Swiss-Prot record:
This is Isoleucine--tRNA ligase. Catalyzes the attachment of isoleucine to tRNA(Ile). As IleRS can inadvertently accommodate and process structurally similar amino acids such as valine, to avoid such errors it has two additional distinct tRNA(Ile)-dependent editing activities. One activity is designated as 'pretransfer' editing and involves the hydrolysis of activated Val-AMP. The other activity is designated 'posttransfer' editing and involves deacylation of mischarged Val-tRNA(Ile). It comes from Cupriavidus necator (strain ATCC 17699 / DSM 428 / KCTC 22496 / NCIMB 10442 / H16 / Stanier 337). Its main location: cytoplasm. L-isoleucyl-5'-AMP binds at E596.
Amino acid sequence: MPDDKRAKPEKSKYPVNLLDTPFPMRGDLPKREPQWVKQWQDKQLYKKIRAARKGAKKFVLHDGPPYANGDIHIGHAVNKVLKDMIIKARGLTGLDAVYVPGWDCHGMPIEIQIEKKFGKGLPVQEVQAKARAYATEQIKRQMMDFERLGVLGDWDHPYLTMNYSNEADELRALGKIMEKGYVFRGLKPVNWCFDCGSALAEAEVEYKDKVDLSIDVGFPFAQADKLAHAFKVPFEQLDGKPGWIVIWTTTPWTIPSNQALNVHPEVEYALVETPRGYLILATERVEEQLKVYGLEGKVVATTTGAALSEIRFHHPLAKMDAGYDRLSPVYLGDYVTTDTGSGIVHSAPAYGVEDFQSCKAHGMADSDIISPVMGNGVYAGTLPLFGGLSIWDANPKIVEVLQASGNLFNSHKYTHSYMHCWRHKTPIIYRATSQWFAGMDVDPADENGKTGPTLRETALAGIDATEFFPAWGKQRLHNMIANRPDWTLSRQRQWGVPMAFFLHKETGALHPRTPQLLEEVARRVEQHGIEAWQTLDPAELLGDEASQYEKNRDTLDVWFDSGTTHWSVIRGSHRDDLYDPSADEADGRLADLYLEGSDQHRGWFHSSLLTASMLYGKPPYKALLTHGFTVDGEGRKMSKSIGNTVSPQDISNKMGAEIIRLWVASTDYSGELSISDEILKRVVEGYRRIRNTLRFLLSNLSDYDHARHALPASEWLEIDRYAVALTAQLQKEVLSHYEAYEFHPVVSKLQTFCSEDLGGFYLDVLKDRLYTTAPDSKARRAAQNALYHITQAMLHWMAPFLSFTAEEAWQIFAHGTEHTDTIFTSTYYAIPEVDDGADDLLQKWHTLREVRAEVTKQLEAVRVEGEIGSSLQAELTIQAGGPVLDALQSLGDDLRFVLLTSSAKVTHAPEAGDLLVTVTPSTHAKCERCWHYRADVGHNPDHPTLCGRCDSNLFGAGEHRSHA
């Protein structure tokens, strides 16, 4: 370190060692941080760090790509800062910690933006060109904001799912999983958004309250003879009598598509006689439902659900239009409950997963499934009574017609949690459409034709082999995989990677050379992007067969885009940076860590697991880390309508990005992360304490050169050895926390270290020695030795989260050393061993600090009484026994420096466990220089205002200390 000039106290002929530092008290973060960002960019800091770690073991944190649309929000900031802290913390261990940021670029939100800006109906190629340009601009904006947060990474070479190479490799991945037999086409109910005009992934569905019409509808008896047999009543009792099996639903719009009824095989059902006619209800629901219907009634017979199997009932709209003149059979279903409603469920197989499965299990052909709702949410014009109406507008009309038919038993408004599109915030439905799926329970075939475990089995085994932070994530993801349906891979969009299949015009069958054709298309996409599929003439690949085939128009689910980045990025576009062959050979898992918000258990974590399970038979990650969502100070979700959103850009501009980083680091990310003005004020205060501690350390090291002034630990004072031993103990804890991706304990312990261990004790004691002993005395240099080691360690602890501040301090602290340029090419500091008996030393000084705390209380009480001003005006007598007495006596006259008094005497206590403190105001004169009250003030007539110690330190051989 350079020798800085020592500041000269004004008008003092007896100077003390008050030094200065270019490290300012005020961080001025909003102004200085952008300068650091530019400096890091100019000197290509990330590249320098990678070069410094060349040949080291890699640590790969694979970036879950944010969507390239709109400005970043506080949730993005949390995510990127967490990743950055982990990369830096791992890098400081000496690992080659690699971070390639990425962006998710295809999909509906960008299509919506293009429609808003340019209108609907553009040719596909034009939509794709404009979408690509739009995404590029959004990425530039987001990248600037991420870099402003102090996030280091390969910003010059990010991965983009719209890069031609990534699009091409995605097609290759599709080809691989098709070869293994995972992909099939089928009719199934999928999440469908009318506004998107497309199927949705599970991760694109959110739930919120919706008010619907709840109705109880009767399906008239059609087979009285079979019912009489089932309930064991005379046929005459039912023949010709009005009767209904009653269902309850909150989706009246599905009634026109009803094709079956479901009962639970083991539930008891009752035949209930009412003035209106006979009703069939679950026995345990009879009393409640009759109240709802306003009917009196009595149970005349009961039977099990199993006995009702295959009995048929008239459609409730049959009397209103011949188009509904059909019978609905009863099918058994274990999923039927009696918690609410009638205990009977109506089944519209086109609009419910369980309905579909039940009807298919009973032999219903795809062609027999009634599906009148079109992709825009409007009934086909051919549907009797309701054709041309949107399903939501049709609900009251359907209720009206049911009322007229005499088959409506109740109707009222009902609020329930319902599926909505996460983009449009509008209600969605299940809708049976022909889609491409990845089968969860398909037995895949390897290259030798041998079948293996299903995708579900492989994925579940992979979860068991993955480490989760926090641990509860394992069960959450396990449950999702265990219960999920087949994955709908296809979408009906324009801005997406095409499912580049050739389908036979008559049969719809895939071309027999589909895997090879996908590779041919991928080569073209690699050169020209997905636009190549639009311009491709099938004859180029199919020759004379071209007239028999047509190009598939579906695109891949965007979760397949991001979910295959382990293939297209780690093994593909960024292979040189991210791929570690040794890790791949060891267990096939390509990334050390995936880190995202808790919603990604059903999103990116989920899709990545499924694609890797299909491609390699293993997860792509060794560990998953999940963080919570940001909420305001009252625990409410961020919402523009509430007005409680917090902009990371605003915080950076007003307080500094360092405050965001410290807030993230100091918060337990495993739960919700609360943020508010009040919370940020507390973070700022915590930052100031750390910064002030750093300023003190750097100031008092500004005339210290470790190469010239280093001393062996045996020549330090005892309190210095204690402080460094305490630092070493804390470093073990800090590094253990970092290893487990725990940041808030590090921040908490660092703040305690600064405020209590350093500011509240060690530095408080040290000031006298630093300021009053001779500048080059062994006592002062010993203190600086300790401060040097403490500062080295502390700056490295801070660097992952207080990156700007650590770098600023480091360039002052490490000036002229090997790693002056940046702290991030160095490693965690190897704190020297200070004492063979470090544990005993720590225990002894722990005891002394407890005594000091008691002494401080007593001094404060006397000060409040007005008997003393500062603690230096006091003289102490301490009575103690046992180990406490031994510890106190071992310090000799140095005890007074530890207790910050002018005198401290120790005697035996009357009882061994007693600690008695007597405070007496000093009667001696005050030394002008050190402010101690001593009997020897003025002993040298040449310096009548100095104590003997200061006289010796300034003009003589200097004082001797051995403990403090």
